[in-house]
């Protein structure tokens, strides 16, 4: 009697490269996305018109730019039908909601540095946080960190500069 069992090969057992955790929504968030989709699926066909994508996203609190909309439509409407299914809409919104969460997390971290609420991270703020975290960094190293993130040359790091450097380092 021949067995259908095959011994695993090196190729079949090798680790796939991790791309990072796939963003997921809570059931409540999925329900919100479904309700926004259904608002624009008036005929109950299970699809919405690509022209309605922006309005549906606005209903969920997002303000996508024109270039971003073109890119999203190209990603989800590959056949050029002008229609988007709920699953495609859910995929787009899952990504957008994950990005929003990431931005909020980064801004929370920014506020921990900005304890004097100036809207900027100064050398003094950075030095305090480094000390609190037990990081043994020289003043020169701390200044280099400020200089690396400071795009407008004012010697401090504002929210936009902080967001940019955190995304660039892939820490978020």
From Swiss-Prot:
This is Centrin-1. Plays a fundamental role in microtubule-organizing center structure and function. Plays a role in sperm cilia formation. It comes from Bos taurus (Bovine). The keyword Repeat applies. Binds two moles of calcium per mole of protein. Belongs to the centrin family. Monomer. Interacts with CIMAP3. Interacts with USP49. It holds the Pfam family EF-hand_7. Ca(2+) 1 binds at residues 41, 43, 45, 47, 52. Residues 28-63, 64-99, 101-136, 137-172 form the EF-hand domain. Residues 1-30 are annotated as: Disordered. It comes from the Eukaryota. GO terms for biological process: cell division; centriole replication; microtubule cytoskeleton organization. One of its GO terms (cellular component) is spindle pole. It is found in: Cytoplasm, Cytoskeleton, Microtubule organizing center, Centrosome. Gene3D superfamilies: EF-hand. Its main location: cytoplasm. Keywords: Calcium, Cell cycle, Cell division, Cytoplasm, Cytoskeleton, Metal-binding, Mitosis, Repeat. One of its GO terms (molecular function) is calcium ion binding. Ca(2+) 2 binds at residues 150, 152, 154, 156, 161. InterPro entries: CALM/Myosin/TropC-like (IPR050230), EF-hand-dom_pair (IPR011992), EF_Hand_1_Ca_BS (IPR018247), EF_hand_dom (IPR002048), RNA-helicase_DEAD-box_CS (IPR000629).
